[in-house]
Amino acid sequence: MAVVVVESPAKAKTINKYLGSDFVVLASVGHVRDLASKNGAVDPANDFEMNWEIDSNKQKNIKAIVDALSNENKLILATDPDREGEAISWHLLEVLQKKRALKKSTAVERVVFNAITKNSVLEAMKNPREINMPLVEAYLATVSYTHLTLPTILLV
């Protein structure tokens, strides 16, 4: 059996019907963490290291995913097929690794589909891939640039 994570609860409900009882489909409800709100969340002097914090409103979603993974041996990240979706998958994987929610034997896959139809979802499940790190890096560059420059822009 596998745990599938999508972004929205409505998608989770529909996709669960398509995949059946061999899958547990849960929603992240968007991003699960963001840059810390304090100064220094991005450190240019330390290779632009970023300090992330989990969104307090997403704790129950993360707990549900962690709990589901305790009984399963596969994680399928099925967030949206864009830069933000790729970033959400990356954030989820990082959080789950830090919480030690993934066993050494847990397979992690990334799937994408452009429509919430049975055919699209089932076809995507046949074509898993890894997280697209260039997309994640584009997201990280945008987030760090915004964090570092927004206070300056607001002062002008």
PLM region spans:
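Single conserved hydrophobic/aromatic residue that forms the stacking wall/gate
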Residues: 147, 152-156
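Intrinsically disordered, low-complexity regulatory segments
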Residues: 1-144, 148
